[in-house]
Amino acid sequence: MGVSPVRDSWLVDEASDELISSERKLIAVECHDDDSQVINVKVEDICKDMSDKVVLKLQFRLCHKYRKLLDITLLGCRMKVYTQLKNTSLNSLKSLLQKRMINICIGNYAIGIRMFFVNINQFIKSCKWIVNTEDVYTICTLYHTRDTDVLNVIK
């Protein structure tokens, strides 16, 4: 057991079943001067394992504003997280996790597919009480209905 990083190396576009290229993953848009949430964290479920430790099911999503700028329909990640916590309330946990993700995203100059996963890994490493991650499921769906270039792109 242990905390393993979330990887984007085999990230597939769900709409076309094609592997997303490294070049596409590096496309990013500026987000450094925005006070809105760049990545949303949702606690889907809280339960206890056999040793009475808290287990979370977390969901991360790139917010709509940046998905639209990047021509991405959906960019997200789900995972089961094992913790050292004995108890917690849903509301305090949601608030703590979102604040931590906001603080990580504040340090970004730009956001794109690669930076999304870098931020999730940084988030997991910053939570010292997380002892293991399992059932990591990444998802990405690119726009295919229009033939436009991504504006304000940073490469």
Swiss-Prot record:
It comes from the Viruses. Belongs to the nanovirus U1 protein family. This is Protein U1. The lineage of its organism: Viruses, Monodnaviria, Shotokuvirae, Cressdnaviricota, Arfiviricetes.
